[in-house]
């Protein structure tokens, strides 16, 4: 088995999943890589936690009770991932003003956290393969660095949302829609 660390940029993946109206069962995703002869030493999962501002902007007719339940559900979901030995990184979703569109939007970016976890892994753990589940082009430089350290890089994401830079630098690409039947939450 090939030792691997897996990094899941859930915020990036969820945007596409929301449009396509399906969900990933992350335990099945890890199982998929295990069946491909990768032994996941650690799995890191990054996702934003809803805030009142973000929740009520998307659900203006919701009640405080519904918000509290949604937040409780998200915390329970993170707990389930932890029970599967995932390292869960979360922070609040923030509202930012987009100068281009002149509208507010919600953002929770984990580029720095994911990069720091990768760097710490390179420095402190013996691993052969890094599996980055994201299509975010901001990780192109990170992947080039890992390749320079003779690491195998797999990028898993959606065909129409993986940045071209990632396609050019990764050793292998896994299109999640191609394995939907194996990883979909049912």
Tell me the role of every PLM-derived stretch.
Residues 1-106, 152-157, 161:
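Domain-level signal for Mg2+-assisted phosphodiester chemistry and nucleotide/NA-binding surfaces
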């Amino acid at each position: 088995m090939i030792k691997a660390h897996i990094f899941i940029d859930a915020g990036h993946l969820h945007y596409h999943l929301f449009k396509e109206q399906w969900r990933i069962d992350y335990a099945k995703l890890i199982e998929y890589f295990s069946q491909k002869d990768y032994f996941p030493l650690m799995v890191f999962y990054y996702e934003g936690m809803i805030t009142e501002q973000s929740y009520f902007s998307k659900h203006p007719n919701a009640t405080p009770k519904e918000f509290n339940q949604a937040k409780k559900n998200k915390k329970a979901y993170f707990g389930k991932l932890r029970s599967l030995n995932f390292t869960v990184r979360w922070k609040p979703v923030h509202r930012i003003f987009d100068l281009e569109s002149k509208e507010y939007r919600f953002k929770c970016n984990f580029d720095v956290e994911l990069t720091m976890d990768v760097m710490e892994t390179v420095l402190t753990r013996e691993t052969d393969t890094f599996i980055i589940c994201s299509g975010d082009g901001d990780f192109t430089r990170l992947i080039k660095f890992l390749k320079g350290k003779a690491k195998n890089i797999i990028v898993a994401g959606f065909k129409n949302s993986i940045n071209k830079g990632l396609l050019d630098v990764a050793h292998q690409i896994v299109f999640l829609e191609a394995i939907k039947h194996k990883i979909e939450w049912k």
